Regions:
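General N-terminal targeting signals
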Residues: 61, 211-213, 259
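Core SAM-dependent methyltransferase catalytic element
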Residues: 243-261
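C-terminal alpha-helical "lid/dimerization" subdomain adjacent to the S-adenosyl-L-methionine
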Residues: 191, 195-238, 243
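Short alpha-helical interface elements
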Residues: 69, 219, 259-260
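Residues in well-ordered beta-strands of folded domains
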Residues: 2, 216, 259
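Conserved adenosyl
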Residues: 1-208, 242-243, 254
């Protein structure tokens, strides 16, 4: 990193393709690096699965799921309960399906071809539908009530919730804003919720796990962990607003509930 910052006039990196990681590997970004090798991709998915076991899971909490998601959810045959956007091989969605048998709708796992291939091989719950999707493109699961162009073809009804787990900290603000704008266009006003499972670090006195991960995100992606004010500003620029933030312990990730502003 010293060499990178010396060449970069000690400016914070903002381009995912020009970071200490890409300088040291001569690759086109971290995700392209891991997807070039099936072994790397498998190890990365195993890392995500292990990480999932280490922290509290808001979607495991029966009271949280019942009071904030199931209550008021649509129950017709085409209803989509939750979309896990960039959900990898589906570890979190599988646990949700196993621990909550009464979910009133479909579960949709979205990611790129590589992770979806891993998911197909892992025999997920029959309630989970797999969908190849790049979150830098239009969200295909969208509601009739959103402000999207009326000429768009609505492929499915809107979901009760769209879930991002450790996705946006991989991207600098401009890229995160692009992702969020696509998602905002899919939300059904007054019904759909955006759930962001990420760290919300305090402006001072942050836990060392959070600050260490902040440096890692900078080195790999030119990205960062965010404070509450960072999140409010970013979501506001995307036409979204925070409804509530849950945090169980200082070192853990938080859950941000947001909706259309």
């Amino acid at each position: 990193m010293p060499e990178f910052f010396s060449k970069n006039e000690y400016k914070y990196p903002s381009n995912p393709l020009d970071t200490p990681f890409t300088q040291s590997t001569s690759e086109n970004g971290f995700f392209e690096y891991i997807t070039q090798s099936s072994e790397r991709l498998t190890v990365f998915q195993q890392h995500l699965a292990a990480k999932s076991l280490a922290w509290p899971k808001y979607l495991d909490d029966a009271t949280f799921v019942q009071e904030n998601l199931i209550k008021g959810a649509k129950t017709d045959g085409d209803a989509v309960f939750l979309v896990d956007v960039g959900g990898g091989a589906g570890h979190d969605l599988q646990e949700l399906a196993q621990k909550h048998s009464d979910l009133p709708g479909k579960l949709v796992l979205q990611d790129l071809e590589g992770p979806i291939g891993e998911a197909k091989a892992s025999k997920l719950s029959e309630k989970i539908e797999l969908q190849e999707h790049d979150f830098f493109s239009e969200q295909p699961v969208k509601g009739n009530g959103s402000d999207i162009n009326v000429l768009c073809v609505l492929t499915t009804p809107g979901a009760r919730a769209y879930y991002f787990k450790s996705v946006l900290h991989d991207w600098p603000d401009d890229k995160s804003l692009e992702i969020l704008k696509h998602l905002k266009d899919a939300l059904e006003p007054g019904y759909s919720k955006l759930l962001i499972n990420e760290r919300v670090i305090p402006p001072t006195g942050a836990h060392w796990l959070s600050t260490g991960l902040d440096i890692t995100m900078m080195a790999l992606f030119g990205a960062k962990e965010r404070t509450e004010e960072d999140w409010r500003q970013l979501l506001g620029l995307a036409g979204l607003k925070i409804v509530k933030i849950w945090t169980w312990e200082p070192a853990a990730e938080s859950l941000i509930e947001a909706e259309q502003a």
